[in-house]
């Protein structure tokens, strides 16, 4: 088995050059020269290059024996030339292979095609993209033969597989046949998360994808001991695309463009799941996607590369070959070089410390990337297939919780079912609308609270099993929550009315916070509020207020109490937030998913422009009350655009705190003062603080609780603090 010449996992500065170019015009790629490209890579200061073996066109860039080579190359092996020249100049080679997006295969083998339910989207008539199905044995054989050939022939240092997901629900004969063989039933025609048959199909799609990628990785590992990864970007968006953490764990590292979701949230998820590191890939310039993407070097560094540095990760810029094979030399020689020169001093910190550490874990659930309002939708419904931005309450709640706690400087990480045996590491765990839960998850969270953990849960968390409705139509965690479910109500707007001083003070000068749309227009989606019956020893923290009418109201029907809004009118005693002791721990359960109601990062209602962080303030106050008064791993007193990521670099007996200044909008300006507090691991004491990478000593004090305090002045982009402990 061939070993790599270069350690790809230690390559900080990388690039991907898109080359999805057809061959029906002899002018295409006429000016492309792999030797000239490697010369530009070297001038940019790159350490690794991801280059194409094929593209979404399905045409290969090496003389393949299976499939078809791009004919404008006239047999020139640009894959082989690129690998050899990269290695000669001291750079790593990462192969790119497009999986199910393959126009050549779609055209020549109709029986391999992915058939979207309703024939919409990629793969339908008139689309530029031809997609094939992972359940097609013929296509799998074709794909594995190509992968086997290319990994035997060339000495890659890593390989990346793009488009490992289901872009639509496939109803091809291959999928129908496989589901019939496995379940004895036909494919369901509509979504129904309470129906065992639908759940079996949804679960099967994920399993099929996992099995397909395992076969791909097995093919590579027969030939080369190199890192393998795919495009992880689709994972946190929707159940429809079929990815899950089992598939992510098959990979040696994780990569993708995380701008499909909140950047910080995406990094948190992937950093917690990855076996090694996370490669953030983002378009810098060139014809990417729908149009030309151009961004200045300074903004590129702040908005993209700086996130990578904050998470001790590589950054991969994305350029695109122009159709004639040209690129901008200035981009490589000047613009890209400026970005990478700023990164280079931190090269030695790549991958240091393992996974981020924190006091609060926000739970991400593959199974809950759905929504109850999807029940009854046909598989071709546009409301189902229009997945961006994500509409799942769990996803919006997970992002909202990350955003609210990040800007309030609460130490957080994202956790998944892979960490179910490690829950005791966290003082507080957040379950944002985790609607579908397995028996293993139910038991793990019960034990966590029973043994002293603190839990926040919202909405329909634990209502459904992986196979449908839970017995008794009640929460699986009802005993832990301290309440039973009476029903689910849908409100255009509801109001949370705090009943204890701590929460009243958190939202002052407000007396209530709105859940949903307090104004008459424009229309907003309805919000779910669970009706609950608390047990006797449960404390009610907040109750429900409702507007004059559930309907929008008009001049004619008089169903409103104020022309501009729908303010509280019906004051109830119905509990919406409760606190309950369970074993040695406690739970705050909220009928409304406060974490989903976060105001945008930029501030303000997108329609009116006036910020209201009421739900965010209430949510943060609840989490801080669960944390209690004991010192946290770290805390900052800083602007909204400043955040920190902490690592326990136990090999060097030090905590590493990466403090980044990424404002909501460019330009980035230095922050005059950031106050920092750091707490050593249990049983340890902080002995010294140093600023990395130079190792300059920092002045600090230590209080009676062992918390080290220091200050960072004029934070421009990044400050890395090493807290040595013993």
Which residue stretches match the model-derived regions?
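Carbohydrate-binding surfaces of carbohydrate-active enzymes
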Residues: 2, 9-11, 40, 72, ...
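Short acidic catalytic loops
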Residues: 49-52, 143, 150-168, 428-433, ...
């Amino acid at each position: 088995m061939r070993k790599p010449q270069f350690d790809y996992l230690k390559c900080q500065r990388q690039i991907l050059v898109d080359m999805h170019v057809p061959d029906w015009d002899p002018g295409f790629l006429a000016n492309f020269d792999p030797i000239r490209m490697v010369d530009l890579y070297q001038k940019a200061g790159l350490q690794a290059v991801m280059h194409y073996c094929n593209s979404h066109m399905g045409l290969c860039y090496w003389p393949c024996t299976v499939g078809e080579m791009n004919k404008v190359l006239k047999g020139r092996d640009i894959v082989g030339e690129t690998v050899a020249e990269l290695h000669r100049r001291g750079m790593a080679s990462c192969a790119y292979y497009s999986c199910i997006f393959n126009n050549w295969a779609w055209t020549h083998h109709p029986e391999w095609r992915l058939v979207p339910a309703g024939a919409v989207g990629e793969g339908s008539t008139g689309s530029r993209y031809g997609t094939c199905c992972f359940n097609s044995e013929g296509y799998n054989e074709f794909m594995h033969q190509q992968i086997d050939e290319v990994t035997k022939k060339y000495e890659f240092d890593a390989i990346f597989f793009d488009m490992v997901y289901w872009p639509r629900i496939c109803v091809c004969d291959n999928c129908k046949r496989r589901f019939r063989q496995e379940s004895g039933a036909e494919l369901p025609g509509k979504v129904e998360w309470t129906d065992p048959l639908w759940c079996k199909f949804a679960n099967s799609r994920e399993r099929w994808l996992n099995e397909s990628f395992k076969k791909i990785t097995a093919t590579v590992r027969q030939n080369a001991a190199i890192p393998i990864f795919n495009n992880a970007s689709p994972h946190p968006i929707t159940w429809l695309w079929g990815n899950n953490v089992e598939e992510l764990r098959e990979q040696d590292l994780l990569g993708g463009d995380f701008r499909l979701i909140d950047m910080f949230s995406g990094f948190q998820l992937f950093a917690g799941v990855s076996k090694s590191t996370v490669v953030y890939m983002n378009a810098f310039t060139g014809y990417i996607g729908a149009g030309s993407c151009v961004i200045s070097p300074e903004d590129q560094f702040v908005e993209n590369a700086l996130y990578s540095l904050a998470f001790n990760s590589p950054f991969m810029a994305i350029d695109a070959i122009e159709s004639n094979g040209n690129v901008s030399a200035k981009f490589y020689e000047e613009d890209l070089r400026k970005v990478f020169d700023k990164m280079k001093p931190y090269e030695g910190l790549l991958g240091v410390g393992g996974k981020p550490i924190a006091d609060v874990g926000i739970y991400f659930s593959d199974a809950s990337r759905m929504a109850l309002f999807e029940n009854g939708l046909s598989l071709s419904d546009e409301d189902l297939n229009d997945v961006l931005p994500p509409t799942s309450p769990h996803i919006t709640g997970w992002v909202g919780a990350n955003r609210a706690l990040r800007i309030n400087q609460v130490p957080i990480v994202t956790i998944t079912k892979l960490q179910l045996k490690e829950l005791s590491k966290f003082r507080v765990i957040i379950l944002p609308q985790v609607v579908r839960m397995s028996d293993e998850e139910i038991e793990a969270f019960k034990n966590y609270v029973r043994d002293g953990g603190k839990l926040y849960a919202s909405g329909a968390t634990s209502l459904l099993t992986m196979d449908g409705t839970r017995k008794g139509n009640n929460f699986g965690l009802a005993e832990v929550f301290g309440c039973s479910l009476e029903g689910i109500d849908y409100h255009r707007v509801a109001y949370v009315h705090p009943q204890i001083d701590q929460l009243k003070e958190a939202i002052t000068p407000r007396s209530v916070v709105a859940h949903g749309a307090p104004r008459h227009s424009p229309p907003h989606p309805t919000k779910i509020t669970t009706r609950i019956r608390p047990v006797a020893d449960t404390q009610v923290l907040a109750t429900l207020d409702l507007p004059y009418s559930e309907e929008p109201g008009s001049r004619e029907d008089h169903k409103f109490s104020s022309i501009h809004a729908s303010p509280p009118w019906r004051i109830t005693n119905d509990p919406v937030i409760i606190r309950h002791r369970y074993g040695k721990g406690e739970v705050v359960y909220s009928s409304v998913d406060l974490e989903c109601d976060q105001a945008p990062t930029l501030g303000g209602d997108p329609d009116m422009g006036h910020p209201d962080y009421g739900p965010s303030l209430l949510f943060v106050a609840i989490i801080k009350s669960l944390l209690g008064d004991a010192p946290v791993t770290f805390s900052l007193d800083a602007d909204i655009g400043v955040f920190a990521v902490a690592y326990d670099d136990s090999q060097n007996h030090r905590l590493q705190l990466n403090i980044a200044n990424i404002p909501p909008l460019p330009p980035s300006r230095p922050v005059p003062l950031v106050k920092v507090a750091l707490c050593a691991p249990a049983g340890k004491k902080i002995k010294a603080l140093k600023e990395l990478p130079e190792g300059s000593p920092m002045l600090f004090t230590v209080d009676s609780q062992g918390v080290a305090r220091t200050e960072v002045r004029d934070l421009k982009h990044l400050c890395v603090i090493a807290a040595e402990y013993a």
